[in-house]
């Protein structure tokens, strides 16, 4: 799962993602949470958009699986992602920024108006999150994520021997 998320993180910067199959649904970032109860200092002066995000957009019906891409950060609980009232999945519980790739089953999109909802789960735990840069790719998730490959080798400069290591890839 993490490998798929990592590939999705790189995806938004790739030229392949900007193809005709790619539709930006919302380019803005939205702070979601409970008003008056900021979880982090950075949200003290930034009131939340609300406890959920409702986004309406026009699209074509999807005869095959498509992929919903959502940039997210500071997620500590499983926020639900719904399309036209149907649950697609949950945001990844991870505080680091990432792009989540959720499969959109065939027939889930309607021709014309559609509604995407990201809503907090019923929980007493505070969870201020940031979501945005939401896009829809008409290709199945496997195809979308298959566009990106990374080949990294870490070797000793003198001997050329492979070195054990841990890498963190970021999009900044």
Regions found by a protein language model. Give the residues of each.
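Bacterial N-terminal signal peptides
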Residues: 4-13
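Beta-strand-rich recognition domains
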Residues: 18-158
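Short, ordered, surface-exposed loop/turn motifs in non-cytosolic proteins
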Residues: 158-172
